[in-house]
């Protein structure tokens, strides 16, 4: 063993064959808002800049070839002004039709398959939240489902979902590839629901688009279009801080733990925490859409 830390600078080797345990320690000299925060830029490009002495976003010049989104990120950081493309946002909103659902799924991934027609680490949906608005000014309604931790949750999940989305209207999600993939997996395993699921998929619209395409971008988003960054940037008064469960990974682990849990009080408490978390996800989408609709 060595008594001194080797004098090796950070580089691509920090990630190979996996992320080094000293990753954060060795990056203490990297400032906030650095080139490593740039969205959609290859790691090799970032380290190429780093080796040339370019570390802060302030040091990135126009001559450096970068993707459009990264250039927007740098420009917003440098001039301190939010980017809001009103025409692009207006066009996006014209493609969304009321009545409108806001939908979010939660899944868990058992390493050892627990159910027929499943595979190791398959994402098994066990919960959804739906907010519903008949029109822009109508009161918000809420529907939800959380499976009992007894047996395969997929059939009760899809049956309740199809029932709860039976009104006409678009279905808004955040990052539609996740929900659509889960729905297609259910239709493959349970083909009796295939036609209904295909119709449901045809109604899905993606709220991620204005942020992914940088129609709306602020420095607080740190180059990300994840809802966990977009929400505090657009609706700072709304956050997950007060919730016992504040991210999807913990929701998965919490639900999976219920299969072994015998204490009814613990079960009820954890179920309530799961319901509150998933409800917050779709309520966040409601508030984000309201913010976009308020742009004149």
Features from the language model and the residues they span:
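Short helix/loop capping segments that flank catalytic or ligand/cofactor-binding pockets
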Residues: 29-30, 47, 58-59, 110-113
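Conserved structured core elements
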Residues: 39-43, 99, 120-124, 148-159, ...
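Conserved RNase H-like, two-metal-ion catalytic cores of nucleic-acid enzymes
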Residues: 88-167
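An acidic- and aromatic-residue-enriched active-site/binding cleft used to recognize and process polar
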Residues: 25, 105-108, 135, 176-178, ...
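Generic, well-ordered alpha-helical scaffold segments in large soluble proteins
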Residues: 49-52, 63, 77, 96-99, ...
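Acidic, Mg2+-coordinating catalytic module of metal-dependent nucleases/exonucleases
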Residues: 1-35, 43, 52, 222, ...
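Conserved DEDDh/DEDDy metal-dependent 3′-5′ exonuclease domain
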Residues: 1, 142-252
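N-terminal accessory regions of nucleic-acid-interacting proteins
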Residues: 38-100
């Amino acid at each position: 063993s060595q008594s001194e830390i080797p004098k090796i600078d950070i580089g691509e080797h920090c990630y190979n064959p996996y992320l080094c345990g000293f990753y954060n320690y060795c990056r203490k000299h990297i400032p906030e808002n650095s080139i490593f925060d740039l969205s959609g830029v290859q790691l090799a490009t970032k380290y190429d800049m780093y080796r040339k002495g370019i570390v802060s976003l302030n040091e990135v010049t126009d001559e450096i070839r970068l993707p459009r989104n990264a250039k927007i990120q740098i420009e917003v950081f440098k001039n301190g002004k939010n980017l809001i493309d009103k025409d692009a946002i207006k066009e996006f909103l014209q493609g969304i039709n009321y009545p409108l659902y806001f939908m979010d799924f939660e899944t868990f991934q058992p390493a050892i398959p627990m159910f027929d027609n499943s595979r190791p680490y398959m994402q098994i949906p066990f919960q959804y939240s739906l907010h519903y608005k008949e029109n822009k000014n109508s009161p918000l309604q809420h529907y939800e489902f959380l499976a009992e931790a007894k047996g395969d949750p997929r059939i009760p999940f899809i049956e309740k979902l199809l029932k709860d989305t039976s009104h006409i209207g678009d279905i808004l999600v955040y990052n539609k590839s996740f929900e659509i993939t889960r729905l297609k997996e259910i239709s493959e395993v349970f083909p009796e629901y295939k036609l209904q699921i295909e119709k449901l998929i045809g109604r899905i619209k993606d709220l991620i688009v204005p942020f992914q395409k940088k129609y709306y971008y602020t420095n607080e988003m740190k180059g990300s279009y994840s809802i966990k960054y977009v929400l505090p940037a657009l609706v700072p008064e709304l956050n997950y801080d007060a919730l016992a469960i504040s991210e999807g990974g913990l929701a998965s682990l919490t639900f999976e733990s219920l299969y072994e849990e015998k204490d009814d009080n613990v079960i009820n408490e954890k179920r309530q925490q799961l319901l509150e978390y998933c409800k917050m996800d779709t309520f966040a989408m409601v508030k984000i859409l309201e913010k976009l609709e308020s742009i004149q």
